[in-house]
């Protein structure tokens, strides 16, 4: 029987870089100008889902470091998960609106650390304003691909999702 915390599995999702020989040069694993150097750096990026109560790995996604996408790996892990209700716990790099919706629609929960609200690439930046201190708050927005004057005038109601941002839940 799987150990649960208040009815949930606790699954930590994180990634690690696995260096390989720089003699291996391909478009998926090799970076040039890594660490301010012109030397090639070849590696894989290992994304894992680890059960904190069972102390076992639940899933892995292996990506070439040059094309790694932690958010894509997180979505793959959530899509493949078929166990009891879970709380997915992850660090920065795994956050996105798409991931939040995906986890919620599968009746799971998430605890994902996000970039600072002042960061240009923070997923939360457009949901503010926020206090300049620690805070917990519920944020509710209607997601849309439209950019009407009504939508632009009410950022407290609507969140525009650009077409170049992955979002699996719009029809069309």
Where are the regions a protein language model picked out?
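Single, function-defining residue in the core of a domain
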Residues: 1-9, 13-27, 35-172
